[in-house]
Amino acid sequence: MPTWSSMTGGVTIRPLRTGEQWLLTEFLYEAVWRPDGAPPVPRTVLQEPVLRRYVEEFGRAADDRCLAAVCDGRVAGAVWVRRMHGFGHVDDATPELAIALYPEYRGRGIGTLLLRAMLELLRQEGCTQVSLSVQRENRAAAWYLREGCELLAERDGELVMVCRLD
């Protein structure tokens, strides 16, 4: 993976480093959406095979990609893609995207920086599209649409979107 780094407003976007893969499990937990006021989801949900595939052995496949946002010396969030049969699967050639931030870093534009950086990285590598899924009630659904993603399908309350990169 080429070295890629950007700094905007005190936020550094860089590739996830060797030894930081454990953070993806933390961010996967943060990516599990729950309505405002709902109790926290038990961490045991991360043992479900449908979720484990988002992080298990991440980095072993040649096309696994992850960018981290660093604020004040701490990894505040991450965006990662891999080809898999996840909630947002559209075809075997399209990688699926996941993104999450720790709660205290949300609403500051860091997610937008991460998403745009990953889309640009994929574009540079010749990828033509990336998919994702988001629950219909999640505020992030409107954000993805504003960022140029297109609604492709709805499956059991999950919106499947595609961001075209060509």
Question: What is the role of each PLM region?
Answer:
Residues 1-8:
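Short acidic N-proximal helix/loop "leader" segments that mark the beginning
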Residues 11-26:
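A short beta-loop-alpha structural element at the N-terminal edge
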Residues 16, 99-101, 134:
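Hydrophobic adenine-recognition pocket in adenosine-nucleotide-binding enzymes
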Residues 32-34, 41-93, 98-102:
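Acetyl-CoA-dependent GNAT
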Residues 98, 107-120, 124, 145-146:
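Conserved acetyl-CoA-binding loop-helix of GNAT-fold acetyltransferases
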Residues 111, 115, 137-140, 157-162:
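Short glycine/proline-centered loop/turn elements that form peptide/ligand docking sites
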Residues 122-135:
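Conserved GNAT acetyl-CoA-binding A-motif
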Residues 145-155:
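Conserved acetyl-CoA-binding loop of GNAT-fold acetyltransferases
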